[in-house]
A protein has these predicted regions:
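Aromatic- and Gly/Pro-enriched helix-to-coil junctions and flexible linker segments
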Residues: 25-145
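Low-complexity proline/serine/threonine-rich segments in eukaryotic and viral proteins
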Residues: 1-12, 92
């Protein structure tokens, strides 16, 4: 009786395992785009209290402007590129005390673990700020060959 396929040998299994293990860091290294991934999170969870409307703005903090993110404040710098644990934004969204955590616990919309990890990864990758797509100058694409 013929076997339709040969069982995986130890070396084939080892090669497959190594391939999977080596591909995981490559997936984690995917750059996080501020405009596509971070700004929508902020818009959904933060801009209500820290956005354009000065009458509703809390803490004198406006998160829709780049200047606010990178200049030192009395409490600390909102984002220290490459250092989430030194970034006030990250320490506030991961704070263990519910009274100090952002968004406040009474807000219906809370950050998900995936959103928190995206913010962490964005900071780790250098916190590259990209303007809203509507402010990016149009470029003519290259002609096809």
């Amino acid at each position: 009786m013929a076997i339709p396929f040969a069982p995986l040998s130890l070396s084939s299994f080892a090669l497959a395992t190594i391939t999977v293990v080596l591909s995981v860091p490559a997936l984690a290294a995917k750059p996080v785009e501020f405009a596509r991934e971070i700004r929508p999170i902020l818009s959904d969870t933060c801009f209500k209290c820290h956005g354009v409307d000065a009458a509703k703005r809390k803490g004198g903090l406006r998160l829709d402007q780049k200047e606010e993110w990178f200049h030192p404040r009395e409490e600390g710098t909102l984002v220290v590129p490459g250092k989430p644990q030194e970034s006030l934004v990250f320490t506030r969204i991961t704070h263990s005390d519910p009274d100090d955590q952002m968004p406040p616990r009474e807000e219906v919309r809370q950050l998900t673990p995936l959103e928190i990890s995206k913010i962490r990864d964005w900071i780790l990758q250098g916190a590259n700020w990209q303007p809203h797509w509507s402010f990016v100058p149009l470029r003519r694409p290259a002609l096809p060959k």
